[in-house]
């Protein structure tokens, strides 16, 4: 029996279509044939009809469902022409099509009016319906997109320029599809872009222009040169400057002059070791006539023990050193978090090649090829050391690999590991691809689940799947620990530490791609399959691919993180978001840094030295008329907030005190905040870390660490008892200055040098002297002066 639905579908296909006409496009061309995939689906995507918040949601909207982001043309064609008894299109009377009536507001539509009846968009839909609402499968398969201009769109101030997008399709034909694209610009203060790709300049600078067309993405930079005379440039110190200056020439931006010696000294000391230079160091550096003094300073700071601690802290963020996720009880987790930090610190201190460090994380096991008895003895020794020192100074950093990376209180699904590894070592965010291909990125569900399945053999458990010899050795050690705990009057539960193993298991866990309901073959991102053979650890092949010189992400991701640390903003920003829609602000510089890094054998210290000794790093934060709007081309130093750990250490450095770590947070005397590995602290310092944005390290996203200024940060410096106590410390800076035999002028100068790393200006000196001389006591004068200085914006920011 013929159903009404089938009859309606047959009528759509059989009845003679309405009269048709060419469509005049807003970019000046004429569209003579409307194609469902190329044009109709392009406009559905551009209008947002197939997004997750509209008809692309799993449930659809008001009975009408499209495929998410238009990835399934067959489904969408059926939804438009067959569902709802075919009422959405009317080939005999196209204007009566529900598709058009809702879009123009003639019929109630939750999405509101999407376009007007007189618009070219209406004409495209109308002509498609009038032509029989046909679909040619595969007609819109995209081979590539080409953009004119292909790299930089230079637009003079207050002028406009049209961007042209050409699609080459799988059948070999090409077409100008500019009006069917969606255009997004990263900074509307620099330029704006209209719906059909016309870019209008607003102020000097550059912005990223992202162009989307039915799942394909291309991007370019919009350049708005500064007006006026041609920019001038100093002699480059190295290749970094040459490539930065090349970009600035396009922008006609003259870089700022060099920072003063005092500013440079403060900047680089905070960046490299999270400390302030002493007053004596500031005076000596400013007076030193040696033309190589900055070079010598950088070399000294890069070799400083605290420099390794700074990068161990950053790498703890990157690798997910989350104390809460480690084995409990809490004191055990904190100790192991510290050991994790110290393992990373030793590798930075020893300048181990970065690719080796990453391989030693990705392929980590507990045994490291040792006999089970050796492993048990090492584990016992480390645990005993950790119990005495709260995790500091153990032998764990001498372990060849970082098995703590894989040790978690709760079992981790394979997809959690893939997201962590991609974000940490490739700068790639995969989360969206778990459910669908994001319209601004390349990764599909098959990419996501295939990459996840590489981690199907890594195991951390109570040795039930371990080799017999390992199981026996661990069982004996655990029994001995239990006996010792009970003999000491402790309960035999978490009071003793179970010996557990991270290893490559014969038990393979493989996840299905929910889109196909089939197991996705393990493979590297966008690359070859990883075959599970015998007892081979698939992570070895993963590590080889990740650290390969040909990997398009590995070296770039790390040099970008280094650049972002020293400049406050990455060449790709956010630093863990390398994607098609987020191109670098200076691609040639990023490529050159990565190439140099690879050729150096992944020498991190050499990379840092290159960056720190560039003229670019040494520029002043003070701007000129041509670069005052610059936010991402490094024509001047950017004023930037400190990391939370730097805030604590810089405050202590200025106030001449050490942080007090006690109880579960206990640390050796004199320990700096950047030397502490635990992400979960309990003392007074925990509040300061939280309000200044230290991350809990619970997700694989750099966005966890916040650098945004907030009122609690200001109130903390102004009123918190912790600051008051440090100001009043008997051996602290205030007491030292108050007791010293200094004139009023000398007191003011020393206070400025100790906090702002410079001498006061004439106005600052006069104002300070007035307050000092009005105070009732020398101690009161000194306390008020130092308190005022640490509450300045200049103090809490790096510039």
Locations of regions flagged by a protein language model:
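Bacterial N-terminal signal peptides that target proteins for export
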Residues: 1-8
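Bacterial N-terminal signal peptides
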Residues: 8-16
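Solvent-exposed helix-loop boundary motif
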Residues: 21-122, 139-166, 174-237, 267, ...
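Sequence/structural segment immediately N-terminal to covalent heme-attachment motifs in c-type
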Residues: 35-52, 120-128, 417-433, 564, ...
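Periplasmic/extracellular electron-transfer cofactor-ligation site
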Residues: 45-68, 130-139, 428-445, 618-619, ...
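Catalytic cores of secreted or luminal carbohydrate-active enzymes
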Residues: 115-135, 712-719, 723, 727-728
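Primarily short, surface-exposed interaction patches in extracytoplasmic proteins
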Residues: 235-306, 311, 317-664, 703-704, ...
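Long, His/Glu/Asp-enriched segments that create or flank divalent metal/ion-associated functional microenvironments
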Residues: 654-678, 682-716
């Amino acid at each position: 029996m013929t159903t009404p639905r089938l009859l309606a579908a047959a009528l759509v296909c059989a009845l003679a279509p309405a009269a048709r006409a060419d469509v005049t496009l807003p970019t000046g061309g004429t569209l003579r044939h409307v194609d469902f995939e190329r044009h109709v689906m392009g406009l559905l995507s551009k209008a947002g009809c197939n997004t997750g918040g509209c008809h692309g949601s799993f449930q659809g909207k008001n009975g009408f469902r499209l495929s998410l982001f238009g990835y399934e043309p067959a489904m969408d064609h059926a939804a438009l022409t067959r569902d709802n008894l075919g009422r959405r299109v009317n080939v005999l009377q196209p204007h009566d099509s529900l598709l058009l009536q809702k879009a123009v507001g003639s019929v109630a539509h939750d999405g509101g009016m999407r376009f007007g009846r007189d618009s070219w968009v209406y004409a495209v839909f109308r002509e498609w319906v009038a032509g029989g609402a046909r679909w040619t499968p595969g007609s819109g398969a995209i081979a590539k997109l080409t953009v004119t201009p292909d790299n930089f769109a230079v637009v003079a101030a207050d002028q406009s320029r049209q961007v042209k997008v050409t699609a080459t399709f799988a059948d070999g034909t090409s077409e100008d599809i500019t009006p069917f694209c969606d255009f997004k610009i990263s900074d509307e203060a620099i330029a704006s872009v209209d719906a059909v790709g016309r870019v209008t300049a607003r102020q000097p600078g550059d912005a990223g222009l992202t162009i989307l067309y039915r799942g394909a993405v291309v991007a370019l930079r919009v350049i708005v040169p500064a007006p006026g005379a041609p920019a001038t440039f100093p002699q480059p110190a190295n290749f970094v400057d040459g490539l930065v200056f090349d970009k600035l020439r396009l922008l006609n931006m003259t870089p700022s002059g060099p920072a003063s010696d005092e500013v440079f000294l403060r900047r680089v000391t905070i960046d490299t070791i999270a400390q302030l230079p002493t007053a004596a160091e500031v005076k000596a550096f400013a007076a030193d006539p040696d033309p190589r003094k900055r070079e010598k300073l950088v070399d000294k700071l890069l070799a400083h023990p605290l420099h390794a601690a700074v990068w161990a802290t950053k790498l703890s963020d990157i690798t997910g050193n989350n104390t809460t996720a480690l084995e409990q009880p809490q004191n055990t987790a904190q100790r192991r978090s510290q050991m994790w930090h110290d393992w990373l610190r030793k590798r930075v201190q020893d300048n181990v090649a970065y690719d080796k460090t990453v391989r030693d994380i990705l392929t980590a096991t507990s045994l490291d090829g040792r006999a089970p008895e050796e492993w048990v003895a090492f584990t016992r020794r480390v645990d005993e050391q950790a119990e005495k020192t709260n995790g500091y100074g153990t032998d764990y950093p001498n372990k060849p690999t970082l098995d703590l990376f894989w040790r978690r209180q709760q079992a981790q699904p394979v997809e959690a590991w893939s997201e962590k590894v991609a974000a940490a070592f490739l700068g790639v965010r995969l989360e969206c691809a778990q459910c669908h291909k994001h319209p601004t990125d390349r990764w599909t569900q098959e990419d996501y689940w295939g990459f996840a399945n590489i981690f199907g053999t890594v195991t951390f458990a109570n040795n039930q799947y371990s080799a017999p010899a390992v199981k026996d050795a661990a069982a004996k050690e655990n029994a001995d620990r239990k006996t010792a705990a009970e003999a000491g009057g402790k309960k035999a539960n978490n009071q003793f530490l179970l010996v557990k193993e991270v290893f490559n298991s014969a038990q393979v866990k493989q996840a299905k791609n929910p889109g196909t309901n089939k197991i996705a073959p393990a493979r590297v991102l966008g690359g070859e399959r990883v075959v599970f053979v015998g007892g081979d650890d698939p992570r070895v092949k993963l590590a080889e691919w990740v650290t390969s010189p040909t990997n398009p992400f590995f070296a770039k991701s790390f040099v970008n993180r280094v650049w972002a640390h020293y400049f406050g903003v990455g060449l790709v920003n956010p630093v863990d978001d390398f994607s098609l829609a987020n191109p670098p602000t200076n691609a040639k510089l990023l490529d050159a840094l990565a190439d140099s890094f690879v050729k150096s054998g992944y020498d991190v210290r050499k990379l840092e030295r290159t960056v720190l000794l560039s003229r670019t790093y040494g520029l002043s934060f003070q701007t000129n008329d041509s670069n005052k709007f610059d936010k991402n081309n490094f024509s001047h130093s950017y004023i930037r907030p400190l990391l939370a750990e730097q805030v604590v250490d810089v405050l202590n450095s200025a106030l001449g005190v050490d942080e007090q770590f006690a109880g579960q947070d206990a640390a050796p005397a004199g320990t700096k905040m950047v030397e502490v590995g635990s992400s979960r602290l309990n003392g007074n310092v925990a509040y300061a870390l939280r309000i200044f944005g230290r991350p809990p390290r619970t997700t694989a996203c750099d966005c966890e660490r916040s650098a945004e200024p907030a009122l609690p940060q200001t109130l903390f410096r102004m009123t918190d008892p912790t600051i008051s106590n440090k100001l009043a410390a008997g051996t602290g800076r205030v007491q030292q200055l108050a007791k010293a035999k200094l004139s009023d002028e000398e007191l003011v100068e020393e206070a400025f040098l100790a906090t702002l790393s410079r001498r006061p200006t004439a106005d600052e000196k006069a104002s300070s002297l007035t307050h000092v001389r009005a105070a009732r006591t020398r101690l009161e004068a000194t306390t008020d002066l130092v308190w005022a200085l640490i509450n300045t914006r200049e103090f809490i920011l790096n510039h």
